[in-house]
Amino acid sequence: MTQQLQTLIDNAWDNRASLSPSAAPKEVVDAVEHVIAELNNGRLRVATREGVGQWTVHQWIKKAVLLSFRLKDNELMKAGDLGFFDKVPTKFAHLSADEMAATGVRVVPPAVARRGSFIAKGAILMPSYVNIGAYVDEGTMVDTWATVGSCAQVGKNVHLSGGVGLGGVLEPLQANPTIIEDNCFIGARSEVVEGVIVEENSVISMGVYIGQSTPIYDRTTGETTYGRVPAGSVVVSGNLPKDGGRYSMYAAIIVKKVDAKTRSTTSLNDLLRD
């Protein structure tokens, strides 16, 4: 079934220029809708973890997300007295109180999660935004004004502090999703984008910006890497000298490995998750 679905989506993607809401084969429309529904309930996800820092990205699922925009017209949506005009409904719009309770998720107004995202049991959405295709795992808090971009993957017991931004894959088009692994703490107003992977148990200080071109410098080893924060790292914003010291350029600096002191200041509050 999955292989047939993947083949159908891949073929539709190759012929996407010919697709529109009024001109698309029913089997393509049904296939895309099936993928979005499976993403919404967590049975499919854009990327699956194979080990620490090792992920397999399912490009065909990302293609289905993109095709869903091609196959739908905008429509009027209401939230109380507010009106919206979009192609993607919100995730919880039509759930009853019992159905919401069964999800095990706490949603603080005016948090928004789009249909096609998955929010696992025990997660908390403060007034924040979770885009289509994203996966937020158990016990994670998405704090106020944080944004989880399209298809981003967030692990268990993660804290995304106020104003954090995780980049999406839809625009500009990115090959791989941004990934935050289990037990990470991302400090206020930090941005992780362009498919960067923050490996498990890491702490990103406030105001750190990491993309694929950002040097990640380990002050202990002197090594500079790109696109990946090693497991258990404590990262702050800094600068590295360039051109013999004539000027400096922004870098993310690994200052140490996570220790007991770090954990005591970034631990999750179980009282908020009852």
From Swiss-Prot:
<keyword id="KW-0677">Repeat</keyword>
<comment type="similarity">
    <text>Belongs to the transferase hexapeptide repeat family.</text>
</comment>
<dbReference type="Pfam" id="PF14602">
    <property type="entry name" value="Hexapep_2"/>
</dbReference>
<keyword id="KW-0220">Diaminopimelate biosynthesis</keyword>
<dbReference type="GO" id="GO:0019877">
    <property type="term" value="P:diaminopimelate biosynthetic process"/>
</dbReference>
<keyword id="KW-0457">Lysine biosynthesis</keyword>
<feature type="binding site">
    <location>
        <position position="143"/>
    </location>
    <ligand>
        <name>substrate</name>
    </ligand>
</feature>
<dbReference type="InterPro" id="IPR037133">
    <property type="entry name" value="THP_succinylTrfase_N_sf"/>
</dbReference>
<dbReference type="GO" id="GO:0016779">
    <property type="term" value="F:nucleotidyltransferase activity"/>
</dbReference>
<dbReference type="Pfam" id="PF14805">
    <property type="entry name" value="THDPS_N_2"/>
</dbReference>
<keyword id="KW-0963">Cytoplasm</keyword>
<dbReference type="InterPro" id="IPR001451">
    <property type="entry name" value="Hexapep"/>
</dbReference>
<keyword id="KW-0012">Acyltransferase</keyword>
<dbReference type="InterPro" id="IPR011004">
    <property type="entry name" value="Trimer_LpxA-like_sf"/>
</dbReference>
<feature type="binding site">
    <location>
        <position position="106"/>
    </location>
    <ligand>
        <name>substrate</name>
    </ligand>
</feature>
<comment type="subunit">
    <text>Homotrimer.</text>
</comment>
<dbReference type="GO" id="GO:0008666">
    <property type="term" value="F:2,3,4,5-tetrahydropyridine-2,6-dicarboxylate N-succinyltransferase activity"/>
</dbReference>
<comment type="pathway">
    <text>Amino-acid biosynthesis; L-lysine biosynthesis via DAP pathway; LL-2,6-diaminopimelate from (S)-tetrahydrodipicolinate (succinylase route): step 1/3.</text>
</comment>
<dbReference type="GO" id="GO:0009089">
    <property type="term" value="P:lysine biosynthetic process via diaminopimelate"/>
</dbReference>
<dbReference type="InterPro" id="IPR005664">
    <property type="entry name" value="DapD_Trfase_Hexpep_rpt_fam"/>
</dbReference>
<keyword id="KW-0028">Amino-acid biosynthesis</keyword>
<keyword id="KW-0808">Transferase</keyword>
<protein>
    <recommendedName>
        <fullName>2,3,4,5-tetrahydropyridine-2,6-dicarboxylate N-succinyltransferase</fullName>
        <ecNumber>2.3.1.117</ecNumber>
    </recommendedName>
</protein>
<dbReference type="InterPro" id="IPR018357">
    <property type="entry name" value="Hexapep_transf_CS"/>
</dbReference>
<dbReference type="InterPro" id="IPR023180">
    <property type="entry name" value="THP_succinylTrfase_dom1"/>
</dbReference>
<dbReference type="GO" id="GO:0005737">
    <property type="term" value="C:cytoplasm"/>
</dbReference>
